[in-house]
């Protein structure tokens, strides 16, 4: 979902 969390 988030590019920083990779989900």
UniProtKB/Swiss-Prot annotation:
Locations listed in the record: Secreted
Tissue specificity of this protein: Kidney, skin, mantle and the hemolymph.
Gene Ontology cellular-component terms listed: extracellular region
Keywords: Amidation, Neuropeptide, Secreted
Record flagged with keyword Transmembrane helix: no
GO BP of this protein: neuropeptide signaling pathway
Protein name: FMRFamide-like neuropeptide GDPFLRF-amide
């Amino acid at each position: 979902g988030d590019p920083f969390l990779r989900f």
